[in-house]
Amino acid sequence: MASFPPRVNEKEIVRLRTIGELLAPAAPFDKKCGRENWTVAFAPDGSYFAWSQGHRTVKLVPWSQCLQNFLLHGTKNVTNSSSLRLPRQNSDGGQKNKPREHIIDCGDIVWSLAFGSSVPEKQSRCVNIEWHRFRFGQDQLLLATGLNNGRIKIWDVYTGKLLLNLVDHTEVVRDLTFAPDGSLILVSASRDKTLRVWDLKDDGNMMKVLRGHQNWVYSCAFSPDSSMLCSVGASKAVFLWNMDKYTMIRKLEGHHHDVVACDFSPDGALLATASYDTRVYIWDPHNGDILMEFGHLFPPPTPIFAGGANDRWVRSVSFSHDGLHVASLADDKMVRFWRIDEDYPVQVAPLSNGLCCAFSTDGSVLAAGTHDGSVYFWATPRQVPSLQHLCRMSIRRVMPTQEVQELPIPSKLLEFLSYRI
């Protein structure tokens, strides 16, 4: 068994070195809580980075301060970096000038994180109520944490204070995602087999339950225009939901094992899913077609072997913001960087016991969390996107596949716009 296709010379693949790391604190800690770093997240505006460092705690650090420390000290631990001064408004509209690091004790094992930002003119989708307990400012930045006991806690990023405690799930909250449109609509995925939709502008009202999964739900992700949601889970499940009507659009068939991670491309034209079957699939979410397969074990395993303990479980997948690259993390102690038009990785990096990964807001850095609660960072593959690709992304942001196929243009151009060449 090999990690790369036979035609690929493993020695010719570029191997990256970390540019920095954030190490988990040492003991003593409550031994009842694990050290695993199940989730990492970057703020939408690139101002903060958060990760669950195990032992019930989440650490928030100014991202620019992290980068400065990486440049000054290489891969030294920067968990004690100094605070960064940036202007902000609190929930009451007052000015604060000292956003800084925060260590948040969430009270239970943290399985999921998500940043959410507020756009005041975006009205609540639920009801029009004149009075609210919380009125979020224009530059409000929130952090949602999903816990082992089924609770979701909402924190003010700038102060580290608890704002809301959302209670409705009965099992682990495995993933969280905010709608990118600034509406502060939050979706949670849980081991209780449900997804729940929360309206934080309506004081955290739980407005909808999405049912359809027959087993654990591992992950969920909004499309860039917030109109579609992907959820993935055990028993090969990949579901797409209409988030205007809160109805299921379709179920995607193809994986042979639990599907544990998903992410949309920046233009919403592609969907990446990662599975324990050793594969990452790139889908067209508008028609359910598989456009590309990224294998992590060769020769490709049979469905029976892929559906078992194959030692190549893919744990996480993330789309870069250039729309050209995808990162995946697997149990073979390797992080892979892929181009969407190549079926082999263009760069790799060693990582033992990895659990999660995410690109920074500008796509220049990849962060990955591990079993021991630490985070490692790599500079990502960079290239100037072609004008053709930029035009394709602009078109696909506003036009689904069905409308593209109806355009009176040459077939080769249709294939390019549909990501088939």
Curated annotation (Swiss-Prot):
The chain positions of domain SOCS box read 372-421
> Is Ion transport found in the keyword set?
no
Entry's InterPro entries?
Answer: G-protein_beta_WD-40_rep, SOCS_box, SOCS_box-like_dom_sf, WD40/YVTN_repeat-like_dom_sf, WD40_repeat_CS, WD40_repeat_dom_sf, WD40_rpt, WSB_SOCS-box_domain
Among the entry's GO cellular component annotations, what is one? cytosol
The record's listing under CDD domains reads: SOCS_WSB1_SWIP1, WD40
Pathway-wise, it operates in: Protein modification; protein ubiquitination
The text the record gives for the protein's domains is: The SOCS box domain mediates the interaction with the Elongin BC complex, an adapter module in different E3 ubiquitin ligase complexes.
Instruction: Quote the subunit structure annotation.
Output: Interacts with DIO2. Component of the probable ECS(WSB1) E3 ubiquitin ligase complex which contains CUL5, RNF7/RBX2, Elongin BC complex and WSB1. Component of a probable ECS-like E3 ubiquitin-protein ligase complex which contains CUL5, RBX1, Elongin BC complex and WSB1. Interacts with CUL5, RNF7, ELOB and ELOC. Binds to HIPK2 through WD40 repeats.
**What protein does this entry describe?**
WD repeat and SOCS box-containing protein 1
Q: What lineage does UniProt assign to this protein's organism?
A: Eukaryota, Metazoa, Chordata, Craniata, Vertebrata
